[in-house]
């Protein structure tokens, strides 16, 4: 699943490609992707201009000229790309936004898990997932006081807590493993067992790692690609995720992979101890 850095990379690319573009018409080939009535969805966006594209956590927010916002969740495999009108759309394209400048904005999703929801701008929090979403992993929102209070009252293991979008927005499996390794914290540690210093270190590593991953245009492990159809580059800078059986960069101990809350989890057994 694309995590915050990947979704932010897509957002930036789409803003360069389609901000200011006007939708002529829409074709929907897999209606379940649309959470609204499909005919109404198509009618309400026809002849509307994409003013900008914002992001909240892992959700893209397409802002339209008529005061509507399309909340797009890519889920596991969703991706957007822009092609000239008439170009082969591919067998996994499920929604096409025909633009008035003879281009098509394609939504492609091999798993068909992605969802689009049209709401009045300002009412994005009525969409499931956004209703309870936590702060963004940036210094201004993810404060030490917030993290200390949140972790202090939870006996939950630290990794699944980091994956809980109601606690912190945008962290997924890759960046949870990476930031816990950077912080030398075992993924199964109870959140309330972390010291203030450990929380402060983890917080800073989350903020720094997400910023660096965005700068690296996200991580391509399976199929992620940018709005320009290019792979991300940050997979070349991962320290622990996907490196089971390889030596830890810091101490040389072999990286192990275990299941934590049903998620494959990579860690250094020497430096990340329970």
Curated annotation (Swiss-Prot):
Keywords: DNA damage, DNA repair, DNA-binding, Glycosidase, Hydrolase, Lyase, Metal-binding, Multifunctional enzyme, Zinc, Zinc-finger. SMART domains: Fapy_DNA_glyco, H2TH. Its EC number is 3.2.2.23, 4.2.99.18. GO terms for biological process: base-excision repair. Binds 1 zinc ion per subunit. InterPro entries: DNA_glyclase/AP_lyase_DNA-bd, Formamido-pyr_DNA_Glyclase, FPG_cat, MutM-like_N-ter, Ribosomal_uS13-like_H2TH, Znf_DNA_glyclase/AP_lyase, Znf_FPG/IleRS. Belongs to the FPG family. Involved in base excision repair of DNA damaged by oxidation or by mutagenic agents. Acts as a DNA glycosylase that recognizes and removes damaged bases. Has a preference for oxidized purines, such as 7,8-dihydro-8-oxoguanine (8-oxoG). Has AP (apurinic/apyrimidinic) lyase activity and introduces nicks in the DNA strand. Cleaves the DNA backbone by beta-delta elimination to generate a single-strand break at the site of the removed base with both 3'- and 5'-phosphates. This is Formamidopyrimidine-DNA glycosylase. It comes from Lactiplantibacillus plantarum (strain ATCC BAA-793 / NCIMB 8826 / WCFS1).
């Amino acid at each position: 699943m694309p995590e915050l850095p990947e979704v932010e990379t897509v957002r930036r690319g789409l803003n360069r490609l389609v901000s200011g573009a006007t939708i002529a018409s829409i074709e929907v080939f897999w209606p379940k992707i649309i959470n609204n009535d499909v005919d109404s969805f198509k009618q309400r966006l026809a002849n509307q201009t994409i003013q900008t594209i914002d992001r909240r956590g892992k959700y893209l927010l397409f802002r339209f000229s008529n005061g509507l916002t399309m909340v797009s969740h890519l889920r596991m495999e969703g991706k957007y790309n822009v092609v000239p009108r008439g170009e082969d759309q591919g067998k996994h394209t499920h929604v096409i936004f025909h633009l008035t400048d003879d281009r098509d904005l394609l939504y492609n999703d091999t798993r068909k898990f992605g969802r689009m929801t049209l709401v009045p701008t300002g009412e994005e929090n009525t969409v499931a997932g956004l209703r309870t979403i936590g702060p963004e992993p940036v210094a201004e929102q993810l404060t030490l006081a917030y993290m200390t209070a949140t972790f202090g009252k939870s006996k939950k293991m630290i990794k699944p807590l980091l994956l809980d979008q109601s606690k912190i927005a945008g962290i997924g499996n890759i960046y949870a493993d990476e930031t816990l390794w950077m912080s030398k914290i075992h993924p199964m540690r109870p959140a309330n067992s972390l010291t203030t210093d450990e929380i402060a270190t983890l917080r800073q590593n989350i903020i720094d790692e997400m910023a660096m991953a965005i700068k690296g245009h996200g991580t391509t492990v399976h199929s992620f690609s940018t709005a320009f159809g290019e792979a991300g580059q940050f997979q070349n800078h991962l320290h622990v995720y996907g490196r089971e059986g390889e030596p830890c960069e810091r101490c040389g101990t072999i990286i192990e992979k275990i299941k934590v809350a049903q998620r494959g989890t990579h860690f250094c057994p020497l430096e990340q101890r329970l």
